[in-house]
Amino acid sequence: MAGKARVHELAKELGVTSKEVLARLSDQGEFVKSASSTVEAPVARRLRESFGGGDKPAPAASNGAAAEAAAPPKKAGPKPGAPKPAPKKVAEPVVEAPVAPEPPAAPAAPAAPAPKPSPAARPAAAEAAAPAPAPAPAPRPGATPGPKPGAPRVPRVGNNPFSSAQPAERPAPRPQAPRPGAPRPGGASPSNMPPRPSPGSMGPRPPRPGGGPRPGGGPRPGGAGRPGGGGGGNYRGGGTGTGAPAGGPPGAGGGFRGRPGGGGGGGRPGQRGGAAGAFGRPGGAPKRGRKSKRAKRAEYENMQAPVVGGVRLPHGNGEVIRLARGASLSDFAEKIDANPASLVQALFNLGEMVTATQSVGDETLELLGGEMNYVVQVVSPEDEDRELLESFDLTYGEDEGGEEDLRTRPPVVTVMGHVDHGKTRLLDTIRKANVREGEAGGITQHIGAYQVAVEHDGTERPITFIDTPGHEAFTAMRARGAKATDIAILVVAADDGVMPQTVEAINHAQAADVPIVVAVNKIDKEGADPAKIRAQLTEYNLVAEDFGGDTMFVDISARQGTNIEQLLEAVLLTADAALDLRANPDMEAQGVAIEAHLDRGRGPVATVLIQRGTLRVGDSIVAGDAYGRVRRMVDEHGEDVEEALPSRPVQVIGFTSVPGAGDNLLVVDEDRIARQIADRRSARKRNALAARSRKRISLDDLDAALKETSQLNLILKGDNAGTVEALEEALLGIAIDDEVQLRVIDRGVGGVTETNVNLASASDAIIIGFNVRAEGKATELANREGVDIRYYSVIYQAIDEIESALKGMLKPVYEEVELGRAEIRAMFRSSKVGNIAGCLVTSGIIRRNAKARLLRDNIVVAETVTISSLRREKDDVVEVRDGYECGLTLTYNDIKEGDVIEAYELREKERV
């Protein structure tokens, strides 16, 4: 059969059922699905042979070689009168040869002189090769007798449809190393191999037709042990066998390409050789090249890579990865050359839900890095800012030049203390001005810087004073004041003692390693006890010189001006004795923004304290994420200043935006550099803010996060950056309950604009204006959109009102209050209303439509029952008091005499 055949056609041809054919194919190791499936030609041929139908294709042979091969051998073999199945078996490949995809010029006769002929085929092979001179002796016919006529047919081992020669039988394979790779589909296996002829029926192997031993020595790669191995070579280009006659047919020998004596299947260059399997690759197992060291190393590293959350990730081997605070998974993946999606999936499997571009907290980055054996270092903002400046060849915090370039500068003194202890009054007395009257509520809500010339030992010496707020909401301002100062004056009221903000100011000063001079104020008031103040401050390591310590105490009265000169003298003595107050004025200026605000006419205005160098008009400056050029400088008296030396506070005009309070100020060469530094700081600030404000949601608390929560959105506007910052921190510090959240969606310096109103309208927010008012048509727009704008001038009023608003947003909590009890004395039945209970009120009040529960033998029978109707003397009443009888109906009918009805109500409880 030249092509594919279906199973049911083969069954019809062989005269058996399709099930028998399928069973036989299964025994032979062929997987065939159904009777309508097709099988290849070699499989069909083996199937016919197994059913005894292998002689059907024999009449197709019409050449002389087949007839000559059909002749029995002369000396040995089957009897003359016996049927000759074996010669037909030899002639069968001749019929199949033209069907193979080889050139038709290849004759069928060379099938006989195969390099390893079976014993039954050797006489026929010798006769077929007779016309050519053969120096090698012919094989001995008697050594290998053919199969007996009655012997069972042995199906061929190979099933290669492209082979040009098919032996009738194969001897036992020679011992050789097994070939790599799995056996071919049509090859012999222990499960489908037919029984071999007995060893006694086979003589010793005759010599090869080519004569001497095959070059190369060892077993032929295409030998009998290879399934499907015949005379066919492995690849194209095979030549004539070594021992083949000169004029013999080409391709007489088999072997690999390039091997001496290797013959091709067809003997023609460029022709495809025989395949090892029925439908397999040419030549059997594929040729495998050796892997490079790089490929092996990559494969090994991939196998050794850690698996985090079911995802295979790179192995860090303890490598240190530096990430900025608020970095995203994309930034982390870029550092370790990984796929961001893999990091997202790994975190998700670990219970953390983030996106690739979302800012991630420090703990999450360190956790993920530890799983991959990376050491993640989250760079602090200070280190990151230093690295940013180093990238522009800039430094901050160091004086340029040597010791000879340093000049003495005035001391910077910060006045600190509890609220209403007299700090601003003291500064007013020193400056001979009145600053306190300008503050709302009599408390300082801004930070101010002034320079005052003080006469000391006949010499006028300047001192820079920084006034910080004492209210508890201005912790950050006090911290900034302590960092920018040289000496701290701690003001303590003699009649009030040490207060919480006093302790906080001490901690700020000690943390900044700043010497403290204590000013005991209000000694002129009744009840003043300076000795008590000295005793209290010893608990905080502030021991007076009178007690053997090194802290200077001065008793003053800011209102009366008592001992002010002694206080200034103590400040100067401390500065001269304990501090090295020198700076280089001949360098580009560096300083700190003490305060900043937005002025309607002048734009962003920053109060800057110069720490080193000289700031001049026209310099390119950058402070935090704000940059610009100095257009104007004004001192504390409102006069223009052309240059500011170290320790000089000035107001700088020329920023493009309002800098943050406490930002470092730096002079650069070009506006371009200032803009680049500001842009990078702004991006870093946004990432850090996003990482801080993002609430981590894990898979465990996902259900709780999805529950409905109340949220109060706020927009903060103030007159300066420090006040807005303090107000935001104070509001975010209000702790009410998890059910209510406070969110500041926008903040800024300046008046309330229409943009703020539109944002508040879109997000249902409340606008808080601190010392500012609405601009232009913002008020009309707010009234039209229904936006609530609250104005405050004292910070604690804003905090109290926002806290009250948050409490009002809490879900109400109800508590149960018992109203009274009634005992059922009689039962009445009505077809309209059901059971009617005749009751006696034993305590309290029974009220109509009140909640009730039914008790029977002090056991609750029914809960959440409602008193649907209530009557007294045939009149409908609202309530019945203690000692009276009544009739009532419940929404529960299973009542009995002796039951007790307990009425109660739920009252809303105030949340605190």
Curated annotation (Swiss-Prot):
Residues 408-579 form the tr-type G domain. The keyword GTP-binding applies. Its main location: cytoplasm. Residues 467-470 are annotated as: G3. One of its GO terms (molecular function) is translation initiation factor activity. Residues 557-559 are annotated as: G5. Gene3D superfamilies: 1.10.10.2480, P-loop containing nucleotide triphosphate hydrolases, Translation factors, Translation initiation factor IF- 2, domain 3. GO terms for cellular component: cytosol. Residues 442-446 are annotated as: G2. Residues 417-424 are annotated as: G1. It is found in: Cytoplasm. Residues 521-524 are annotated as: G4. GTP binds at residues 417-424, 467-471, 521-524. One of the essential components for the initiation of protein synthesis. Protects formylmethionyl-tRNA from spontaneous hydrolysis and promotes its binding to the 30S ribosomal subunits. Also involved in the hydrolysis of GTP during the formation of the 70S ribosomal complex. This is Translation initiation factor IF-2. The lineage of its organism: Bacteria, Bacillati, Actinomycetota, Actinomycetes, Mycobacteriales.
